[in-house]
Design a protein with these regions (language model features):
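Glycine-rich, acidic/polar active-site loops that bind/position phosphate-bearing ligands
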Residues: 1-208
């Protein structure tokens, strides 16, 4: 949902009985972090002054100079389909506290891409940037890892693996390196992938 004003967002919150508003950011390693406030506290001041956070815990600043603010981006708002409490979630920008006004933190990923687009247009390279990330990952049933002075080990397992042929598979086990575009019933995660795709489409992410 693309909110253009805080009034539109507040109206949606009331109409849909949203109880919490969640703000998502990434740290220096690219991991999601979030700050959550009651929906009743989400107002014009939130958009103007932002939400304060300690940038040192994100890897963005030293402890002695770590005060930063998060400014929400209403155009990224969506209802969190996984939260048990009705929650509106959105991303935004990390800013360095400064006077007379705060300034964008130049290492924050969203600010990096904004500068890249600005440079692209100013230099005449192009007038539009299209980014198509590939959602590639593995699904495991169990992952174990251990690091000790005398030992480093990692163990993974999935029911689709060829080493599980003795686990009452009734002939449906995928052979070694034979799982590319495999069909049912060997493809055990079709429903999982389909649900992921539907959720992304609902959030405006077009899936090829």
């Amino acid at each position: 949902m693309l909110f253009k004003t805080i009034e539109q967002a507040k109206e949606f919150i009331l109409d849909n009985e949203i109880e919490m508003v969640d703000f998502k950011m990434t740290d220096i390693d690219g991991r999601w972090r979030h700050i959550t406030i009651p929906a009743a506290r989400f107002n014009e001041n939130t958009m103007k002054y932002g939400i304060g956070f300690d940038g040192s815990n994100y890897g963005y600043a030293p402890v002695e100079n770590s005060d930063m603010v998060f400014i929400p981006d209403l155009s990224t708002a969506a209802v969190d389909p996984f939260a048990e409490v009705p929650t509106l979630t959105m991303s935004g920008d990390a800013m360095i506290i400064d006077r007379p006004e705060n300034r964008p933190f130049d290492q924050y990923p969203r600010n990096v891409i904004k500068r890249a687009v600005e440079y692209m247009r100013e230099s005449g390279i192009a007038d539009e940037m299209i980014i198509g990330p590939e959602f590639e990952f593995h699904v495991f049933d169990n992952v174990q890892f251990e690091t000790r002075p005398e030992c480093v080990r990692c163990e993974i397992d999935t029911e689709e693996a060829d080493w599980n042929t003795g686990s009452s598979e009734d002939g449906f086990q995928i052979p070694h390196k034979g799982g590319y575009h495999i069909g049912a019933p060997q493809d055990r995660y079709y429903n999982l992938r389909s649900e992921m795709c539907m959720l992304m489409e609902d959030w405006g992410v077009k899936v090829k």
